[in-house]
């Protein structure tokens, strides 16, 4: 037990805790971000979270009771709704790496907001117990988080990463398209040349040539 309880103080565990805490804080303040910023940051922090989780030392539960949890249904729903609002029409994506594919030959529709909320729930519960500072529950919380990484949220993280990658580059394509549309739109400016005849600024000399021909005919 002494050896197992010391696992929580290993370097790889501390690094995972640091990244996990930052991941939770990032999602909690996501509502105030632009979608492009959120997507770009997610594509950086999610691979790091996966890497640190995959480097955790083997850990097994030593207590008789399950550790406390932090994320309630209300907390989960608030986060999911905020993320769904942020992602908008880019929230849904098609996935084949889900258990439901056993019963279907078609991709299953998933959502980035729900996947991230699921990951958040596991990570936040772990961080909450870790911050309590009790060795036994810290150890057991780590063991549960590690098990869920292999069985649940690790796969969701990878799937979400793929979807976010697609969103990022679709956003860039949309921005380039908008820029091209703006470049193709002509609006005369004060710097454009104009006839300036008689104080006129019509940008059309032909109107004055027509007027000159009309006046000439009348004089004859």
Question: What is the meaning of each model-derived region?
Answer:
Residues 212-219:
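Conserved small/polar residues in nucleotide/adenosyl-binding loops
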Residues 2, 14-73:
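N-terminal interaction modules that seed assembly of large macromolecular complexes
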Residues 17, 43-50, 80, 113, ...:
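Generic structural concept
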Residues 88-154:
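Amphipathic protein-protein interaction modules
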